[in-house]
Amino acid sequence: MSRNSTTMIPKRIASIRFGLMDPTEIRKMSSVEVKTADTYKDDGHAYRQGLMDPHMGVIEPGLLCPTDNCKYDESPGHFGHIQLELPVIHIGFVNLIKTALKATCNSCSKILLHDADGTHPSNPGLSEQDYYRARVRDIITKHGVGSTEFSKIIKEIEKKTSEAKRTICMHCKSQQGKIVLDKPTTFKENIAAQGGGKATERKLNARDIREWLQGIPKEHLIFLGMNKENRPEWIILKVLPVPPITVRPSITLDSGDRSEDDLTHKLVDVLRINQRLRENRDAGAPQLIVEDLWELLQYHVTTYFDNQTSGIPPARHRSGRTLKTLTQRLKGKEGRFRSNLSGKRVNSVSYTHLTLPTSYAV
């Protein structure tokens, strides 16, 4: 080739940055809103806005994907989304939620660090916020966000903001409580009564937490270990992405029946409870019933992400087999990274043995 092969690459990927996704962005990239838990009709065609809607990709020869007009072996598949009736907590970010709640005010959502000049430990012309902001930026520059030093400084800030003497917010003068996490996703705030009375306990649901996190100023996100491009309230899910059908294909058995993937089974549970929750809210059901269904929705979304979460029973198939959901599909020796991407196994392999002719004297 006379032409340099590198010139044929229009862009080079310098790095990949992982972050939180805006619910609006999830809806934009979605090819269809999934509303029904049904998969296939009696005639074998997929339900429109169902979990096997062809807009999310096709897996059968002869069919074209309506989204990109490609055949099954050419279409990469497309994401859909489920609009959740009530917000739920993402199990993967529980520790970040705990840090954010402990480090910020329950009323104004500002970081519980002084912003007045003279509160800097060594420089009287600067504030406590200036001190920790400079330290965090210095550690990011020298060691990076994945370093032990970065984790230590965020823990130090959390410990500083949770001191007993900071029970009153220095910004709005509101009384602060102690944040308690009952695993896996239940948060409570214990507020000590004035004058030595009995402390009050307030349970924080996902909607309360989302409103709390929504008020955190973007210039205070650095104290939580976050950058300004991400928002902490995105940890509380209002929209659930649905993976393409190519990621969770159904299998046709010898009997002619279809066997669905474990992820599809779990998404069916999410959709059914989400629909029941919507119907009960529309019918004006008692708050107790709504809260029970809300907790059940939280359980199904949690086990969809990680079916080995401590403190709750794992989701199972009708046969009693434990479902293999997203975390189990990726992690461990049998997961995608170690088994598939780093694996050395191939479909076919051949060996050869080269030797010298016997007439050669060696």
PLM regions and their residue ranges:
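Conserved core architecture of multi-subunit DNA-directed RNA polymerases
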Residues: 1-351, 359
